[in-house]
Regions:
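The feature captures the beta-strand-to-loop junction immediately N-terminal to the Walker
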Residues: 34-36
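Conserved ABC ATPase signature
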Residues: 125-129, 133
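H-loop (His-switch) and adjacent beta-strand-loop-beta switch element
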Residues: 196-211
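Catalytic Walker B motif of ABC-type/P-loop ATPase nucleotide-binding domains
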Residues: 150-154
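Conserved ABC ATPase "signature" region
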Residues: 103-121
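ABC ATPase nucleotide-binding domains
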Residues: 211-250
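H-loop/switch region of ABC-family ATPase nucleotide-binding domains
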Residues: 185-186
């Protein structure tokens, strides 16, 4: 169940974010999406989710595949009057509908809450949750969706270290189950440790390959020819190829 991009150009109106991206992501890939703010990371995730259409080219997904998409927390209204369990239940809508009896899925919801450590907060309203607790609840919602492709947009922003550690373990578990996970993020150390593949977006160009091709602990690094572009760049600098920030291996 591969995810394919064929000369895909993405953007809004006359503003192009990604131009002519081609790549083939095998089922079970664990991919970090990196780039500066506004580079097009969110645009790429929205296109995969089907929320926007490519300006040119196409994105091919497996037929009947389920997709779970988690937007950035700033796009989520935490004052909406529902509790944690109800939020998690909304993950069932994609395959059982809004009005169908959801009681047969109670054990699935309970299991999801246990996996993210929120059993005791099931009846708490969203506005009482910390940033980390809200993100745990949103990950529980993804669990009940039972998706083949999981898209996460900056899932670690504004959360504590323990929550980040637990959610990274869950992401790794999803990948081990054969699910394809794409995650937009900035931290090069997290990318290096947990994500075997990555998509780097830079000035409308997107490059896909093994993370080791992008992150090198030497001063010299080479961006080899990748699927999406025949361009070969050789550079000598002390900066991370992810976001031009200082990169140190400790």
């Amino acid at each position: 169940m591969d995810l394919n991009f064929k000369k895909t150009t993405l953007g809004y109106g006359n503003r192009i974010a990604i131009k002519g991206f081609s790549a083939k992501l095998k089922a079970g890939s664990l991919v970090a999406i990196t780039g500066d703010n506004g580079a097009g990371k969110s645009t790429l995730l929205k296109a995969i989710a089907g929320l926007i259409k490519p300006l040119k080219g196409k994105i091919t997904k497996p037929k009947k595949s389920r997709i779970a998409y988690l937007a950035q927390q700033c796009d989520i209204d935490q004052t909406f009057p529902i509790d944690v369990k109800t939020l998690v239940k909304t993950g069932l809508w994609s395959f059982c509908g809004l009005w169908k009896n959801q009681r047969p899925y109670d054990s699935k919801i309970q299991n999801a809450l246990e996996m993210v450590g929120l059993t005791e907060l099931a009846t708490h309203s969203l506005e009482t949750l910390s940033g980390g607790q809200l993100q745990r609840a949103l990950f529980a919602r993804i669990i009940v969706q039972d998706a083949d492709i999981i898209l996460l947009d900056e899932p670690f922003n504004g959360i504590d270290r323990n929550t980040q550690k637990d959610l990274l373990a869950l992401i790794t578990y999803w990948q081990q189950q054969g699910r394809t996970v794409l995650t937009a993020l900035h931290d090069p150390l997290v990318v290096q440790e947990f994500f075997p593949q990555m998509i780097q977006i830079n000035q409308q160009n997107a490059f896909y390959g093994e993370t080791t091709q992008f992150l090198d602990n030497t001063i010299d690094y080479i961006m080899p020819p990748l699927i999406s572009n025949s361009l070969c760049i050789s550079a000598r600098k002390h900066l991370s190829p992810i976001n031009d920030s200082l990169f140190l291996r400790l």
